[in-house]
Amino acid sequence: MTTLRRAIALLLVTTSCGGEATDSAGGGGGNVGFGGAQDIGQFRAILDAGGIPGETTLDANGFFAEHYSESPPADCGQPLCVVARMAVGRDWVGGQDQAVVQLSLTTPVDPATVERRPLNLVVVIDTSGSMLEDDRIGYVRQGLHRLIDELEDGDRLALVTYANGVTEWSGLEEPIDRGTLHEVADQLAADGGTNIYDGLERGFQIATGAFDLERQNRVLLMSDGIPTAGNTDEGAILGMAEQYVSDGVGLTTIGVGLDFNVDLMRGLAERGAGSFYFLESPQAIAEVFGEELDYAMEPLALDVAVEVAADPRWHLGEVIGTRYWNGSGTEGGVTLPAVFVASRTSDQPGEYGRRGAGGALFVSMAPISGNPWKATGPVADVALSYRLPGSSEIITQRVAVASQASSEASDPWLSAESMAEHYAMYSMYLGLREATRQAEWSYQCAAAALDQLDRKADTWNQDAADEDIDADRALIARFRANLTALGAAPVGGDYAASCLGGGDGGTGDDVVYRDGPYACSAAGNGGGWWILALVALVYLRRRRP
């Protein structure tokens, strides 16, 4: 498998843009990431290029997937458990009181014990003219040669390329005709537009025609641009993918370049019970494909539903970590087609880097009256239901959430010690999101938000020593330097308070936008196993060994 990972990494290398361990008997538990994005590679790449990223490039699911957060053991006696914890504190940037319930799914399953089935893998590659840049197509050839050599005998690989039109180079046949596939790899050339619709449809047709329940049936789509040829309507592309995914074929998407259609690629993956990745470096490629092949295709549970009902004294606010939450102010929930064991098992970046840590679901809570520091007692009830692969039996679990916060409590008050890392991750995300929002109208206010966030993160990490938070602070420094280069002067005093409090700040001659904040080139995020209701690939984390 290691050689296979290297082969796929080589295949895709040029599509890129330039606490202590604790023991737990009987296995551990962890968080779940809701949604398709598994990194914030585009956000990071824009910063590396000297730009100012827009809010849409900071995907909550991707951000959480790059943070390992400890969770309690999976001790409910089932393969899947729900854990609900709460924090009451103050926003790291604005200082407002806030209460949040964080939901995790945990499992005793060890990622090292997960074995993948043989592959029915259809690779759909963009060979448009832009693939000539930096000899990307040359590296694709080299990678294909390596991949062909390293696939296991039981695997099947089909190859489709698309530019203005579509070419089917090989089907899903067994045994693999390695000689013919090597000849095909030598012939790949780049030219023309980007006909994603026809290329993806042909990939699905091949996968559907050879569908086998004893195999992993998946299409892997790579593109470095937005649709420019054939049917370019995003709704049509998404609708076509939904039809094929309903037949049980998964879809993973890989986005490359700063100007690709992140929302379309992410939406396709989410509709396909798959992941969306952005490749910003050769290292990222190795991380992505190691995780995708080894962990992201064998579901632990199907038809997973998480529901939250607020106590009459509380109501639900913003939900961060899934785009598919349905509900009102008193109750809500999310349905997930499948959940998978995550690959990362500690806060140290491992074989797959910072990806693969899973994710989190945060539900903002507010008391009907008063402030969250005084609303003690019951807060919400949480219900989990799911079924195991190959079974129709529905397994259920219920847990209750309560607050014991008080005005004398330290900031933050945590319902469990294991909530600390989650709360810091949540606070960092909110702070970075606030900075991207401020940058839309004032670079100086964005800089002020980042300065405040960094001070809070520094204070927090003096005790926590979380390497993921250190990595976030490096992003803050890069973001801050880019703002300074674009004219953001030092901010302080009343002006800073006005910015952080959401006032009118300081737009005008002191703000230099140039090309403005970089955002997605289009819109939408979206997956299904067999069922397409609410689509999200979910990873389950384990406790540190």
Regions found by a protein language model. Give the residues of each.
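Juxtamembrane/start-of-transmembrane alpha-helix segments at the extracytoplasmic/lumenal side
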Residues: 518-530
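DG-centered beta-turn motif at the end of beta-strands
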Residues: 125-128, 140, 159-162, 203, ...
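Sec-dependent signal peptide recognition
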Residues: 2-10, 527-532
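Von Willebrand factor
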Residues: 17-150, 158, 167-169, 173-215, 258-261, ...
